[in-house]
UniProtKB/Swiss-Prot annotation:
A GO term for molecular function: ubiquitin ligase activator activity
Identification of the protein by name: APC/C activator protein CDC20
Residue ranges of the motif D-box: 17-25
Short motif C-box, span: 144-150
Domain comment quoted from the record: The KEN box is required for the association with the APC/C complex.
The species this protein was found in: Saccharomyces cerevisiae (strain ATCC 204508 / S288c) (Baker's yeast)
Pfam families per UniProt: WD40_CDC20-Fz (PF24807)
Gene: CDC20
Length: 610
């Protein structure tokens, strides 16, 4: 195809497609996508008669049809031959010979124990064809007593750790996860009903030692108990309840020119409900409240590799392919500053912390930039050997999590600029990183195509506290919550993962049980590259290689789960004077809010230098 006609075709396609326009929910914008037009065609040729096809030894005269005529094969009128069963006489002689040969070789190679000088099994019995059951009976009768042989220690006790091995296979439906957990809870309930301890052996050959008094036992347990052993004491988990989520997207927007690259972060959603998306060399802003679309900038010759909103939601940082990072003011739609890394490679990941911005490059360096000073690079960390494709600051700013193409997760101490922990558990690139909002010390990381796992880390001890096998590539992770009416309206901690092949699904897991509670199968035609959670924490925006931006309602609105103890405390406070406590809380909140606002700059010119 000549280049001129190809350019005209591309121009025609781009002319018919408007950026971030509402696509039809029924057609899912299949015809307008280049990927679907090239990969989604299914061509089926009808069976035609060729000149080389001749029917011989037929009673009918030869067919002299043209090459373009459709040929239909005649049906076979002769009945199919009868099938030969395996137990028929045809296989009987051969089967008996093999059986006798195997029995003789097994008996000749087996040696039996003896008592004194007499053999337990006589040689005459070995010469006769006997079965294994007869041999076992002779051995039992000749021996003086029967001693059971324990094949393993785990055979005679119920180990809670082995119960997790009964998890369903990856990519299993939420119903399969519910059935697996039902079996686990059933085993635990049976053990409790029978009066058996989960770590107690069933067969015991010695009597139990005398028990001490209850007071002495409690004091001993309190002395030996530590924080970690106390955390490991788990109650019988309640059965998970499958959640019903809408598998159809609430809105579909067209995103022509989106880069199908797993290592890039091209989507960001601000707290002011403005979604920023990078389409090739241009950056667009979509207001989720009004639906307005605006073009912020178009670099024409430079590709955008990462996009992230600042903490004040008034500025946005753009990582480019040439190694530079630009900061734009959204209100004035103008460029504020350009920060040059000097590396000459693309900036694929960004993370803000007040006036500091961390940039991850393709060469493996992490640069900490201070936007208030002229020499913006204040620190450079070069511990990764591959591209840094994931960065995320902790809420308190004391730690920074990074994931790279070297299959490594690192947790950095921002005060010493040194990595506290370096984890190489993943077997693929780590892009998805997310800090837990309920337990700030818990970090979730997701691996790529060959890893397919989600690992949970304790950022204080560096220990891995849980894992989930998703069965697909993990491109993003987001924490959410749901509320159940069966458990008194308590909050369920959940995490949503977006993936790629084979199902391009959105999966929701319960953090406590690690079971899948909901999923959206085939959410996109291609793999999901990026996703962002809305400011209210309910809607998930996903974009994939099919050049479609979709919005799914996943979580319930964010609110703090109240327990029964909180209700009792509120009642007690009401007796001693609830109004006084409320006034004190309001004063403390006003002081904290004033301190927070005083720390942030009031205008752009105070901390941004051109």
């Amino acid at each position: 195809m000549p280049e001129s006609s190809r350019d005209k075709g591309n121009a025609a396609i781009s002319g018919n497609r408007s950026v971030l326009s509402i696509a039809s929910p029924t057609k899912l914008n299949i015809l307008s996508s280049d990927w679907s037009r090239n990969q989604g065609k299914v061509s089926k040729n009808s069976l035609k008669r060729s000149s080389s096809l001749n029917i011989r030894n037929s009673k009918r005269p030869s067919l002299q049809a043209s090459a373009n005529s459709i040929y239909s094969r005649p049906k076979i009128t002769i009945g199919a031959p009868p099938l030969i069963r395996r137990d028929s006489s045809f296989f009987k002689d051969e089967f008996d010979a093999k059986k006798d040969k195997a029995t003789f070789s097994a008996y000749s190679s087996r040696s039996y124990p003896t008592i004194g000088s007499e053999s337990v099994v006589s040689q005459t019995s070995l010469s006769q064809p006997t079965t294994s059951r007869e041999v076992d009976e002779q051995f039992t009768v000749a021996a003086d007593r029967y001693i059971p042989i324990l094949q393993g220690a785990s055979q005679n006790k119920v180990d809670p750790e082995t119960l997790h091995e009964a998890l369903p296979p990856p990519n299993a439906s939420p119903i399969s996860h519910l059935r697996a957990q039902t079996k686990i809870v059933f085993k635990q309930n049976v053990a409790e009903a029978c009066g058996l301890d989960m770590n107690k052996r069933i067969l015991q050959y010695m009597p139990e030692p005398p028990k001490c008094s209850s007071l002495r036992q409690k004091s001993y347990i309190m002395k030996k108990r530590t924080h970690y052993s106390y955390q490991q004491e788990q109650k019988i988990p309640d059965l998970i309840k499958l959640r019903k989520i809408n598998t159809n997207p609430e809105r579909i927007l067209d995103a022509p020119g989106f880069q199908d690259d797993f290592y890039l972060n091209l989507l960001s959603w601000s707290k002011k409900n403005v979604l920023a998306i990078a389409l090739d060399t241009a950056l667009y802003l979509w207001n989720a409240t009004t639906g307005d679309v605006s073009l912020l900038t178009d670099f024409e010759n430079t590709t955008i590799c990462s996009v992230t909103w600042s903490d004040d939601d008034c500025h946005i940082s753009i990582g480019k392919e040439d190694g530079n990072t630009e900061i734009w003011d959204v209100e004035t739609m103008s460029l504020i500053r350009t920060m040059r890394s000097g590396l000459g490679v693309r900036i694929g990941s960004l993370s803000w912390l007040d006036t500091l911005i961390a940039t991850g490059s393709r060469s493996g360096e992490i640069q900490i930039n201070d936007v208030r000073i002229k020499q913006h690079i204040v620190s450079t960390w070069a511990e990764h050997t591959g591209e840094v494709c994931g960065l995320s600051y902790k809420s308190d700013g004391l730690q920074l999590a990074s994931g790279g193409n070297d299959n490594t997760v690192m947790i950095w101490d921002t005060r010493t600029s040194l990595p506290q922990f370096s984890k190489k558990t993943h077997t693929a690139a780590v892009k998805a990183l997310s800090w837990c909002p309920y337990s700030p010390n818990i970090l979730a990381s997701g691996g790529g195509q060959t890893d397919k796992h989600i690992h949970f880390w304790n950022s204080i001890t560096g220990a891995r506290v849980g894992s989930i096998n998703t069965g697909s590539q993990v491109s993003s992770l987001h924490w959410g919550q749901s509320h159940t009416s069966t458990n008194g309206g308590m909050m369920n901690k959940e995490i949503v993962a977006t993936g790629g092949n084979p199902e391009n699904a959105i999966s929701v897991y319960n953090y406590e049980t690690k079971f899948k509670v909901a999923e959206v199968v085939h959410a996109h035609e291609a793999r999901i590259c990026c996703s962002q959670l809305s400011p209210d924490g309910t809607t998930l925006a996903t974009v994939g290689g099919d050049e479609n931006l979709k919005f799914y309602k996943i979580f319930d609105p964010r609110c703090t789960g109240r327990s029964r103890e909180d209700g009792l405390m509120d009642g007690m406070l009401g007796l001693i004077g609830k109004e006084g406590c409320r006034t004190n809380d309001k004063e403390n909140r006003s002081k904290n809010s004033s301190e927070i606002h005083t720390r942030r700059p009031s205008s752009t010119s105070q901390y941004l230098i051109r």
